[in-house]
Amino acid sequence: AASDASTQFEILDDSFEQASIYNFDGSLRNFVELKQGGKEKFQEIIDNDIYSPYNWMVRSYKEGEIIEGMFQFKPDGSPNGYRIKIPEDYDSDSLSEEDALALVEQNINNQWSGNFSDYNLIESSFKEMPNGRIDHSFLFEHNLQDIGEAKYRLRATVSGSIINSVSPFAFVPESFKREFANIRSDNDTIAIFANFAFLGIYLLGIGVTSLIIFYRNGWLRGKKSVLAAAFVALFSNILVNLNFYPTIWMAYDTASSKSQFLSEQLLGMVANGILMFFILAASFITAESLTRKAFPKHIQIWKTWSSNVANSKRVLNDTIFAYLIVPIKLALVGAFYILMERNFGFWSPASSSFDPNYLASIFPWYTGLAISLQAGFWEEMLFRAVPIAAGVLIGQRYNLSLIHI
């Protein structure tokens, strides 16, 4: 569909490459769910098909070229607008405002599937480019006024004699944007403090201190933990980023070379993977050393699935129990969300049940597996093994029966 769309513009020839990504505009959702009827109203907006907050974005680009195209499609594949980036010095016959508006009215549905008769012109403007070309901009508003101060709008621009953009969007009041920014700032402050507490106090303070004590007392057990950390960092960070290679070109600046951009991306992936390796290694070593000291009779985690241990009744019981506890944990999470939303006014925004961007990756099945791999290892080590084992050792050291398991 994107290839067919780009062929309608002479300035986008067959030599242009394409990249795609699934995009969501959350501004209208935030306004509607908080101020204008909640999730039911937002679902109604999606169903009436006047405005689509979910879209596939397809980019047509070429190395060294300023000219590029961005085509937008609804989830069902119908066209939902586009934007052609045209250089200021591009020569094209200039039109009067009346002729430019007539051109828009005649051709706007070529790459947009809305009903243009439901829109009224509310604003128009023009700008003269350095080469004398006249560019026009027209802003339309939908007749339906059922979302309070928010509005369904459509912007069309004409560069010379080319309709270079048709952009449907939702206008959200500036007052709400400021209010929402204040809400987000509180959440961001909490997140910053939590990250500081996690990295500064929990990981660096407790983790590094524990490693030093283990090393001095000969308790340090790290070889297999380091190998596990390297495995997780490689498969859950570096390779998962490489899996999204087709989508990274959405951020490519055509003013630079493709080789330079790709080198920068690869270096960033490797650097992030190395950083994650050190964090994982410190977490795994701390967890293994603590649990071996606190629970010397427990099965060592890295030997669980070895041939002479995996067939034991203890491993079978632990595995069955782990699966049986999953529905209990899911029920607790669900109950927490329901309690917070209904009784304490917490807001949980609506979102897709899955991320279609997985389909744009090289191996769609791999990303979910990689994320689960890291979460399963790291959360088990850092948020279960470390605090439980530390509590046991503290209890043994100070004879505190409440935390002496």
Walk through the language-model features, giving the residues of each:
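Conserved structural-core and active-site-/substrate-pathway-adjacent residues in large, well-folded domains
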Residues: 1-2, 77, 104, 161, ...
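Exposed beta-strand-loop-beta-strand "reactive/processing" segments of non-cytosolic proteins
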Residues: 7-75, 120-160
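Long, charged/polar, surface-exposed segments that mediate recognition or autoinhibition
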Residues: 57, 61-63, 69-123
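Short, solvent-exposed cationic patches
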Residues: 94-114, 179-208
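Extended, hydrophilic extramembrane loops/domains of integral membrane proteins
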Residues: 149-184
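Core alpha-helical transmembrane segments of integral membrane proteins
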Residues: 184-372, 378-388, 392
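Membrane interface segments of multi-pass transport proteins and intramembrane proteases
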Residues: 391-401
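Conserved small/polar residues in nucleotide/adenosyl-binding loops
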Residues: 403-405
